[in-house]
């Protein structure tokens, strides 16, 4: 008795224990959603999961029990189960028959639980179907609205799969029950099936025939999502071969199912075997063999002619899938007539050329501004601000807390004292000190502002490195920042986190986070709050798991000096007909949501930036309290919204081929583009501030060049606009195809071939310095192109990268100078807009201004020559080469 009781207790614990974990997770999730103000989102999801799970689970259980109940009724004449090959071994059927009902219930419960869990995981398909909308664009083959494919087809396929599993499971369990009861016999003479058993199984077979017919019907829609080799979507062979066969099979299969069921009912196995053979043969011939012959003998010799209408469908729907129709194509008639006056007229563009690369700058920030080992700069982001009245591109990096680098690791330090990061490092993209280091607008702890950007709330409780829970408002003061005289402490004053105001909550959170310290700590008071889901990516994904989120969240400073994160979110689908998928199967993508997360109190807001997106329309109907219009976003945050780099990369990868809208040109790949590669990596889009051709003012844009496929000259440059009413507008500026326009790889080769530059790089390397070549940027100015590449030097791989040189290429000239202003002076002559700073930075021998007297130039040349001789005598060959380079430029000026 005791043994049975212990067994029961152990089984009960094994069954209940997983549910305890589930209930704990459910409760903490509920508290999290209540804290963030999205309880309705949580409950909608819970209702959908619970409803779907119950419906699928109960349906399967009821159907299985109905069939098992019928199978278990009555008895059969045979008294025992004969084991084939087992000699005299027999099992008493009456004894075994008593187990049919309890075992059947147990198996039904297990299968129902699995089916319910499977259905609960497909809750999103259920909600999309229930809240579906029409798109207003029909597929060109079957005439169904695109909304059917996006919202209805996944759910209908789900029902078909469930129905098939339900009938198969009932058939197997019923057959097993009949075997145990004696309705099905197996012995050395063969198999025997009772007439009542045949009738039961015949009904199930007929039902399965309906499921197979539904599968053929749905497969016709799948043709529009297939890959036929030349393109994605239904082609000539699919429409004129497979589609007709699938339609025939859709109507023929139920008839075949009835005949098959009739044969089983009567026990006529010849009649029963005929229909499956016919269906399988028709499928193989009509869906496999005939289309292959049609492709080989009719389509292949006339592919372009026959496939043109379907290619047009493919082009249209792929362009719609990635929103490529909004890209405006503009001819860009490039020339090499850029002058000093043009440079002066585009001063804002020049000043905002990004010289600081992310990787070297992150390393430099870490060494100059990390302050303590437990702080860490995880990433550097680009943005734009009005700084001292000037529209400026900046680079910003949050100073987050790295728990892995805490000097003393214990629960109190990690959970109560060190709770947050502190402040940002913030500076211009192009300005450098005399030592080759970045300049700052905001730096240090506490924040020191060297411009009119103020940070009033520097604490970062929510970030990219905040992966652990913390408890705030405890008896233990929180560490804020270090000073020369000691540490400054703080107490959290925000509304983030969940109050731990009861013993029950303490116990539940202690169990959830697997530590008794939350329950036992005397430092935790009724006013204390536990903050979890602090990682901003995890935080927004928990609230909206149906969205995809950008890999690069970025921080902004609002007008009140508070730190906010902006995360780009995407809606997506893999169900758009005729659209080419990217890796992962997605063939519809929109950046239709911007998410703002407060770095101090964790407040999350979702804003719809693309109201035309059909997916976000449906999600807005499913979760009516989740999204706000973009107009509701505070104006000081809206001016920092930017076009996502990741999104433009996907669009550019598609636009490289799908800018060709003529099916013949697309088929022959006559004008295929590619993103240029430098080394082994393709170029990435980069942000800059510039005046677009035909526009009157500078604006913040995202830019990416293209080259023709397998060639290195430029074909076009793609730009996505980020500011105000122009946000989201994309232009492709195309170059003349009959002229050679140097591409990044060709400019890179010319830089490598320049004797002076290569000599300098070699000398630096020989002295033990690590030479880091920054990103090569293409900068359109007026009707010309500048190429700019920064050079960084570090004493070794662990050294501090310093920006020591800037290479600028224009036309056939390549120059390298200490900064961008000097390089532009050498190329175009002095500019008034460069002003005193450039003049002060210029060493003796810098090129003279336009219009300088010849006598003055001659004296300048002689001075340079004398310095070169002195350096030669001293053995300073690097300096000697530099002076000769300057002498060459002065002589060119004299020759003009």
UniProtKB/Swiss-Prot annotation:
Q: How does it sit in the membrane?
A: Multi-pass membrane protein
> What are the annotated GO cellular component locations?
extracellular region; plasma membrane
What is the first-listed, main subcellular location in coarse terms? membrane
> Which residue spans traverse the membrane?
6-26, 46-66, 99-119, 158-180, 201-221, 245-265, 271-291
Subcellular location(s) per record = Cell membrane
Q: Coiled-coil stretches, from where to where?
A: none
Which terms are listed as keywords in the entry?
Cell membrane, Membrane, Transmembrane, Transmembrane helix
UniProt lists the family membership as follows:
Belongs to the UPF0182 family.
The molecule here is called UPF0182 protein GM21_2279
What is the originating organism of this protein?
A: Geobacter sp. (strain M21)
């Amino acid at each position: 008795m005791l043994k049975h009781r212990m067994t029961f207790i152990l089984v009960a614990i094994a069954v209940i224990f997983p549910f305890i974990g589930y209930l704990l997770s459910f409760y903490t999730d509920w508290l999290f959603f209540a804290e963030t103000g999205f309880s309705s989102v949580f409950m909608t999801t819970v209702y959908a999961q619970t409803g779907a799970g119950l419906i699928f689970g109960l349906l399967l259980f009821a159907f299985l029990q109905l069939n098992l109940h019928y199978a278990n009724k009555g008895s059969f004449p045979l008294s025992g189960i004969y084991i084939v090959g087992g000699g005299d071994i027999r099992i008493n059927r009456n004894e075994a028959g008593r187990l049919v009902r309890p075992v059947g219930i147990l198996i039904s419960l297990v299968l129902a639980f699995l089916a319910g869990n499977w259905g609960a995981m497909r809750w999103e398909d259920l909600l999309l179907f229930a809240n579906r909308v029409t798109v207003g664009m029909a597929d060109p083959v079957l005439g169904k609205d695109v909304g059917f494919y996006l919202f209805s087809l996944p759910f209908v396929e789900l029902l078909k799969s469930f129905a098939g599993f339900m009938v198969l499971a009932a058939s197997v369990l019923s057959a097993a029950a009949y075997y145990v009861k004696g309705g099905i016999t197996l012995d050395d003479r063969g198999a025997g099936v009772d007439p009542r058993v045949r009738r039961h199984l015949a009904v199930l077979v007929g039902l399965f025939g309906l499921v197979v017919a539904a599968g053929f019907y749905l497969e016709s829609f799948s043709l529009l999502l297939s890959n036929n080799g030349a393109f994605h979507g239904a082609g000539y062979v699919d429409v004129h071969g497979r589609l007709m066969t699938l339609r025939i099979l859709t109507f023929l299969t139920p008839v075949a199912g009835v005949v098959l069921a009739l044969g089983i009912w009567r026990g006529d196995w010849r009649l029963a075997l005929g229909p499956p053979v016919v269906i399988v043969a028709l499928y193989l011939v009509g869906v496999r063999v005939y289309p292959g012959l049609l492709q080989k003998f009719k389509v292949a010799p006339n592919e372009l002619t026959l496939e043109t209408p379907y290619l047009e469908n493919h082009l249209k729907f792929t362009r719609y899938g990635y929103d490529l129709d909004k890209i405006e194509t503009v001819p860009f008639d490039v020339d090499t007539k850029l002058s000093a006056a043009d440079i002066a007229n585009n001063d804002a563009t020049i000043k905002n050329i990004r010289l600081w690369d992310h990787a070297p700058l992150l390393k430099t920030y870490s060494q100059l501004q990390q302050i303590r080992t437990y702080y860490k700069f995880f990433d550097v982001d680009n943005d734009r601000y009005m700084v001292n009245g000037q529209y400026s591109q900046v680079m910003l990096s949050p100073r987050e807390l790295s728990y892995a680098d805490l000097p003393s690791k214990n629960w109190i330090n990690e959970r109560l004292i060190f709770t947050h990061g502190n402040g940002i490092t913030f500076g211009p993209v192009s300005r450098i000190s005399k030592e080759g280091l970045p300049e700052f607008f905001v730096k240090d702890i506490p924040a020191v502002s060297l411009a009119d950007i103020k940070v009033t709330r520097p604490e970062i409780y929510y970030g990219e490195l905040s992966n652990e829970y913390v408890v705030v408002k405890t008896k233990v003061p929180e560490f804020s920042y270090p000073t020369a005289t000691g540490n400054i402490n703080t107490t959290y004053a925000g509304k983030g986190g969940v109050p731990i105001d009861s013993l029950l909550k303490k116990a539940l959170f202690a169990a959830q986070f697997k530590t008794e310290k939350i329950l036992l700590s005397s430092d935790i008071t009724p006013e204390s709050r536990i903050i979890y889901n602090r990682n901003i990516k995890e935080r927004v994904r928990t609230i909206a798991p149906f969205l995809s989120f950008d890999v690069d969240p970025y921080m902004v400073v609002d007008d009140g000096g508070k730190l906010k994160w902006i995360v780009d979110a995407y809606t997506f689908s893999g169900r758009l007909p005729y659209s080419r998928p990217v890796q992962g199967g997605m063939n519809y993508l929109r950046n239709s949501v911007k998410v703002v997360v407060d770095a101090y109190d964790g407040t999350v807001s979702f804003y719809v930036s693309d109201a035309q997106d059909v997916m976000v329309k449906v999600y807005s109907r499913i979760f009516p309290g989740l999204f706000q219009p973009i107009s509701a976003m505070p104006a000081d945050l809206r001016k920092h919204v930017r076009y996502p780099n990741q999104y433009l990369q996907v669009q550019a990868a598609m636009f490289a081929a799908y800018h060709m809208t003529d099916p013949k040109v697309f088929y022959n790949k006559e004008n295929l583009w590619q993103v240029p590669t430098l080394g082994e990596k393709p170029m990435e889009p980069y942000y800059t501030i510039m005046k677009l051709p035909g526009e009157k003012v500078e604006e913040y844009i995202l830019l990416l060049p293209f080259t023709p496929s397998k060639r290195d000259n430029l074909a076009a440059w793609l730009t996505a606009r980020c500011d105000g009413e122009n946000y989201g507008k994309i232009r492709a500026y195309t170059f003349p195809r009959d002229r050679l326009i140097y591409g990044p790889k060709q400019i890179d080769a010319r830089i490598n071939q320049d004797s002076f530059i290569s000599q300098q790089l070699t000398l630096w390397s020989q002295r033990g310095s690590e030479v880091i070549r920054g990103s090569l940027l293409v900068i359109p100015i007026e009707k010309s192109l500048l190429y700019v590449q920064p050079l960084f030097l570090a004493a070794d791989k662990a050294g501090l990268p310093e920006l020591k040189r800037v290479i600028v290429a224009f036309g056939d000239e390549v120059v390298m100078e200490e900064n961008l202003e000097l390089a532009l002076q050498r190329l175009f002559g002095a500019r008034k807009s460069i002003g005193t700073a450039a003049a002060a930075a210029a060493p003796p021998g810098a090129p003279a201004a336009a219009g300088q007297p010849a006598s003055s130039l001659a004296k300048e040349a002689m001075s340079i020559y004398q310095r070169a001789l002195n350096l030669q005598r001293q053995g300073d060959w690097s300096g000697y080469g530099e002076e000769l380079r300057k002498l060459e430029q002065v002589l060119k000026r004299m020759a003009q």
